[in-house]
Amino acid sequence: MAPPRWHHDRRRMAIFVRVGLYTLLFLMGYVVPLIIFYNRSRADTFEDTPRSGEAFISDENFFHCIAERLSYKEQHPARIPYVLIPVTMDYQDIKQLFCNITVPMTYIMFINNGMFRPLRSLLDRLAVDLRDYVDQNLFIIHHPENIAYASAVNEGLRHALNFSVAKVPWVFITNADVRFAPGLIDEFVSQANEKTQGQLERIRRLDQEIIAEARTLRNVPNRRFAFRSSQHPIITASSLPYRIRTMPPEEMKKQFADTYGIFYTDHKDFMATFALSRLAIATVGFFDENYYPAYGEDHDYVWRMAALGYQKYFSEPGKFVHFENANLNVGGSARNRGIFKNTAYFLQSVKFGRMNYQPFRLQYRRAKWFPDGVTIYQDTGRNPLPFNGTIPLDMWVLDTDRRRSIWEIGENIRCHRDYKPYSMKLLDFPVDPS
């Protein structure tokens, strides 16, 4: 017997109700927030608030602090020769930083990574207010596409290398989310100046050795160890000779054991704020840009320095503060008052969070330093040389396809599962025997 008509009507009505509820949920949970975020992102809602316990610093006071730091003569004995600071969403932090450091600075380089419009506006207004310093002592570069931390530092280092060793004997590289106790930076500058004396002559001797290599090196077992490049995808240091590149790890560690290469404002190996000597940059090379978008490039650089035997300078404990993961936690206090109050921070931090997926970073780190290790802690199971010594210590080979895949994940163009791991085939590049 056919079911009653009212039974069919109830089933149809239930289907309509479910479809309607699903549609409503979709609109409320996806479309409406998108519209709100779109409208608010156009307005770029933003609150310029200091961290808890810190005094508010206005934009005008920040401009004054920068001008005061740059107003001293470059021969000032207590100066920081070159300040390199990559920034992304560090609006109030950069103001606190430059008003917290009171020593003279000869050159300041801001490299702005990302599309955080409030910060772009601040730096644009800084350039207008300090127009007499721009491209003389003050340099500002914008990368709305976000070239990542390692690439930003490398761009700043290349710029710093345009100055003589006498003018820039070391480069001061810092995050914005750091603070210093009175007297810390003064002592740091004094120690860095003292411990980098005499490096110019050593760089000169190494460069002469490399020039001679071009005439004397023939039929070497692995020509990659005689290869040099300053262009992507293969980057090498300028002044590490073949003789040192091919040494066994035990012998290599002795080469710079009498030399300070890195200086920390912290009392331990922590690269939130540090300085590199010109000799270290010339021999260790540039930061590995395969660590993308951030984190891991610092350990990699320290391990390469350790392989060459460089000494480290540490500051006294208790005088340095770092607010860790500031880019991931930025705007936390405002988020507590409602996420829609902080759209400018939120959209940028979400994109960074998608890109900064831990398995992406650990895959390359393991391949380079821990191919046989069960763990990938700093001092457990790490090989003494990158890629087990198959390429020179100072060399890295950029995998542009891998970087592109991570960027597309950040832009929500690609899913995490479609990530492209680092291609080890890139290390086996051909070298022209001529």
UniProtKB/Swiss-Prot annotation:
Task performed by this protein: Glycosyltransferase that may be responsible for the addition of galactofuranosyl residues to the nascent lipophosphoglycan (LPG) chain. It could alternatively be involved in the synthesis of the galactofuranosyl donor.
Membrane-topology annotation of the record: Single-pass type II membrane protein
Cited InterPro entries: Nucleotide-diphossugar_trans
Family named by the database record: Belongs to the glycosyltransferase 2 family.
Organism taxonomic ancestry: Eukaryota, Discoba, Euglenozoa, Kinetoplastea, Metakinetoplastina
Record's protein name: Galactofuranosyl glycosyltransferase
Transmembrane segments: 19-38
Known pathway: Glycolipid biosynthesis; glycosylphosphatidylinositol-anchor biosynthesis
The entry's keywords: Endoplasmic reticulum, Glycoprotein, Glycosyltransferase, Membrane, Signal-anchor, Transferase, Transmembrane, Transmembrane helix, Virulence
Organism of provenance: Leishmania donovani
Top EC group: transferase
Lumenal side: 39-434
